[in-house]
Amino acid sequence: AGKGIVALAAYAELLKLSGQESESAKYQKLAQGFVNDWLHGAADGDHFRRQYDLPGTWSQKYNLVWQKVLDLHGLFPDSVFEKEAVEYGTRRQSYGIPLDDRHNYTKADWSTWSAAFYKQAYLMALRKHV
């Protein structure tokens, strides 16, 4: 869901850059509405669920990195990134953070994308394990 929401916001930005302000506003409002739905549907205490209807699940939200890469300020609030970064710290194993609650393996590319959630101090501490 997050990837699609970011894609809508990116499309809104493209419309804005091409001078189509009213169309841009429509898609930005749609994306923000989906963010609000996601925040409520995926909330699971100290983290966000892997799937809306599965409480107790978790996953790396690596596709939210594109909000930061594309500089889409104000879409998903910073609290989402902060909350997820704390959760990932509790899930970290010697080889990294598993992709989700179903498996113990990870992928370096997706974990790298998730690293965008962390503050600089955490990244420096993590560096000694790489």
Where are the model-predicted features located?
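Mobile, glycine-rich extracellular loop/lid and propeptide segments
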Residues: 1, 8, 15
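Short alpha-helical scaffold segments that flank and stabilize functional sites
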Residues: 7-10, 34
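Inter-helical turn/loop segments and adjacent helix faces that build the functional surface
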Residues: 11-28, 73
